[in-house]
Regions:
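Extended, low-complexity, amphipathic alpha-helical coiled-coil/linker regions that act as scaffolds
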Residues: 1-190
Length: 190
């Protein structure tokens, strides 16, 4: 199980780097780019491990990431604002589903939503993107989020020497059933 977790963390790190590179050229707020590459990538990888890369849940989570990117784009027309407000509950539900899937802490959720809410409010005031620009951004987001997730076969063998900290440390998270299998107990139970 621990070797599996190590491989999962290495895959997660690779996918995070992949998404960061793919999302970098997109005109998106940095907190959204960071959230998708660092947090949402974990939800996508976890769902893919549980259900397979082409599962309905993975497709739904990819779509939610695309909708998140598009949700903060300016909406100048009343029809655009109305469509956004109609889609918002579904987006929030899917974001919460993904965050719950990886056990993202409540405090981090509050911080993220504290940034997202003003971005959504600001998007309702701005000058709408031209249709061409909107469609181009949507395609770029689809392309970035549609890239294949890394596979364990693509990973180089683990380093036998002492690892060098190059990036943020991705905190390993164990599902309740995994924690039980390796003998971990919940802090509240101690």
């Amino acid at each position: 199980l621990l070797a599996e977790k190590e491989t999962d963390l290495r895959l997660q790190q690779r996918y995070t780097q992949q998404l960061q590179a793919l999302l970098k050229p997109l005109p998106v707020a940095e907190f959204i780019r960071d959230f998708i590459s660092q947090v949402w990538s974990q939800a996508l990888m976890h769902a893919a491990r549980l259900d397979g890369d082409d599962s309905a849940r993975v497709k739904r989570l990819r779509h939610a990431a695309r909708e998140l990117i598009m949700s903060v784009q300016p909406k100048g027309l009343p029809e655009q604002r109305k469509a956004f407000l109609m889609q918002l509950p579904t987006l929030m539900k899917e974001l919460n589903e993904g965050m719950d899937l990886i056990g993202w802490p409540e405090s981090a959720k509050k911080t993220f939503f504290g940034l997202l809410l003003p971005a959504h409010a600001e998007s309702l005031k701005g000058q709408a993107l031209r249709t061409l620009d909107y469609n181009l951004l949507a395609r770029q987001a689809d392309s970035a989020l549609g890239e294949a997730m890394p596979d364990a076969a693509e990973l180089p063998p683990p380093q036998a020497n002492i690892p060098v900290l190059r990036d943020e440390v991705i905190e390993p998270r164990f599902a309740a059933e995994e924690a039980q299998r390796i003998g971990l107990v919940d802090e509240a139970a101690v």
